[in-house]
């Protein structure tokens, strides 16, 4: 459990409308459940059009986890277009494939993780800002991925990392320097993530 109350925990608006872009992942509705504690939610599949996304006129967008690689349109659908065309104006949170897509959409590279991880918790070191405001250092984050952000574009700061057994640092969070885009590689909605509700609440409190 979190040992610190996140900054802005009581500041979530009661009229928020959050749109999920579902990358066909079993975790999507766990995320929806978390967000539904604070906001009205709507889910569209990544096969939706950009017009569909814009027509919803959300206060925020969450890009779900999912299988595949962001270079493949069949895996991410409208996700990259959302990141490039909508997210500069609409606060956006990417999770797992959502992070990989954000990095890829802005010119970064995505490679293979040193080892595939599915359902293990790792300590997350972070900068204490944005979705990490008020959270303890080294909280346990549930990881489920075989890809990793290898080269993060200059438009982003690396906001969170974890280390492998040999000391290799892996990107676990990014934040755009100008646009309201944040993303995490771990899964806030996993039972393995000790502060998952706090991460979501911090994102919503920042709207």
Swiss-Prot record:
Pathway in which this enzyme or protein is active: Amino-acid biosynthesis; L-tryptophan biosynthesis; L-tryptophan from chorismate: step 1/5
GO BP: any one term: L-tryptophan biosynthetic process
Residues that bind L-glutamine: 66-68, 146-147
PROSITE patterns: GATASE_TYPE_1 (PS51273)
Tagged with keyword Amino-acid biosynthesis: yes
InterPro entries: Anth_synth/Amidotransfase (IPR050472), AS_beta_subunit (IPR053448), Class_I_gatase-like (IPR029062), GATASE (IPR017926), TrpG/PapA_dom (IPR006221)
Listed EC numbers: 4.1.3.27
Keywords: Amino-acid biosynthesis, Aromatic amino acid biosynthesis, Glutamine amidotransferase, Lyase, Tryptophan biosynthesis
Catalytic residues in the record: 96, 187, 189
MF GO annotations: anthranilate synthase activity
GO cellular component, one term: cytosol
Domain Glutamine amidotransferase type-1 as annotated: residue spans: 17-207
Reaction catalysis annotation: chorismate + L-glutamine = anthranilate + pyruvate + L-glutamate + H(+)
Enzyme class: lyase
Quaternary structure note: Tetramer of two components I and two components II.
Other noteworthy facts: Component I catalyzes the formation of anthranilate using ammonia rather than glutamine, whereas component II provides glutamine amidotransferase activity.
The protein's name: Anthranilate synthase component II
Species this protein is from: Haloarcula marismortui (strain ATCC 43049 / DSM 3752 / JCM 8966 / VKM B-1809) (Halobacterium marismortui)
Gene this chain is encoded by: trpG1
